[in-house]
Amino acid sequence: MSNQKISVGIDDIAIHFPRLYMDMRDFAEMRKANYDKLNKGLGLKAMSIPDVHEDTATMGAMAVMRLIDRNGLDPNKIGRMYLGTESALDGAKPTATYIVDMLTQRYSERYGDDCFQNCDVVDMTFALSLIHI
């Protein structure tokens, strides 16, 4: 048995929320829903709403960009990313494909056109983004 220490855990996390919000009172009124159930029962005060240029792929790309930039990561050295969302863009192509395409455009000038070529991307079906180096 080896005495080598193995480090396991989450080193960093990034989340992107849209900047637009709707007050939960307005939401309840428009949906003819019970505000007290939403506010007191679920603890909701407001709901974020994607702007016209935002979708699950752009929000995921923003979160991953924040992780890469904040930690000074070289995309060529990222071995695996776990990307997930509860809301797919279409039924034919994983959202992770769109995210990696955007990230490649963002980092290709600095790290090369194939900077994510050796990165395995796992598309999950729940809201999560992880990077494994």
Model segments located where?
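Short glycine-rich or small-residue beta-strand-to-loop segments that form or flank ligand, phosphate
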Residues: G79-S87, D123-T125
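Short beta->alpha junction loops
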Residues: D51-D55, V122-S129
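Short Gly/Thr/Asp-enriched flexible loops that form oxyanion-binding sites at enzyme active sites
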Residues: G91-D101
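Active-site metal-coordination/substrate-binding segment of hydrolases
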Residues: M102, R106-V121
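Conserved small/polar residues in nucleotide/adenosyl-binding loops
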Residues: I131-I133
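Conserved "HGTGT" condensation-loop signature of ketosynthase/thiolase-family condensing enzymes
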Residues: M1-Y82, V100-S108
